[in-house]
Design a protein with these regions (language model features):
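N-terminal beta1-alpha1-beta2 submodule of the flavodoxin-like/Rossmannoid cofactor-binding fold
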Residues: 1-104, 167-193
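Short, glycine-/small-residue-rich phosphate/pyrophosphate-handling segment
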Residues: 103-156
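Beta-strand-loop-alpha "switch" segments that mediate conformational coupling across diverse proteins
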Residues: 158-163
Length: 193
């Protein structure tokens, strides 16, 4: 059993990444980390090639290596900071690019019988969403992630951790650390049930 944890902050020791790691460690499940701050992931161009070519995205960048990891995962932790009142651009780019996976192995998807629908390769996979912010709008960022991962990819959200940490280090906020540990336990329980 394996989970994939997306660490969506550009800063390696960010509060977001710390919480994602705590959740992963507490879950006790083998975890593959995708650290967006270390990768070159270009934005989706909206070319629709993935819909016509069985989910193959034509953009040659680090996202190509992430696709197989995502498909093989039994569950997910998706974490990102709130920048300018919503989820960060890095997490949004990554999320947009996961859309290609909805078209894997189904043939051309844009036709009269099934326009734009695709499949749900992440269907019912237990997922924890993580958002941090210095000042607010974490609820909006969580909603953005829920729209993409719950409504579109059909994951099963078992918990969400949305923390206002100000300019503080999350290590100094025991309640936030406890919420992250509780989320890790929920993820573990969901994966083992």
């Amino acid at each position: 059993m394996q989970i994939v944890a997306v660490c969506g902050s550009m800063r390696e020791e960010s509060n977001t990444n710390k919480l994602v790691r705590i959740i992963a460690e507490t879950s006790g499940i083998d975890c593959e980390f995708i650290e967006l701050g270390k990768l070159n992931i270009k934005p989706c161009t909206g070319c629709s090639v993935c819909m016509m070519n069985e989910g193959e995205c034509p953009i040659d960048d680090d996202m190509q290596a992430a696709y197989d990891k995502l498909l093989a995962a039994d569950g997910f932790i998706i974490g990102g900071p709130t920048y300018f009142m919503d989820i960060s651009g890095a997490v949004k780019n990554f999320t947009d690019r996961t859309m290609a996976l909805k078209y894997r192995d189904i043939g051309p998807a844009y036709n009269e019988d099934m326009p734009w629908l695709g499949t749900a390769p992440f269907n019912d996979k237990p997922t924890v969403l993580v958002v941090t912010t210095a000042g607010g709008y974490h609820d909006r960022a969580i909603e953005s992630l829920k729209l993409a991962y719950d409504d579109c990819h059909r994951v099963r959200i078992v918990d969400q951790v949305a923390e206002i940490v100000g300019m503080n280090d999350v290590d100094d906020i025991p309640e936030a650390l406890e919420r992250a540990k509780a989320a890790g336990k929920k993820l573990s329980s969901a994966l083992q049930s």
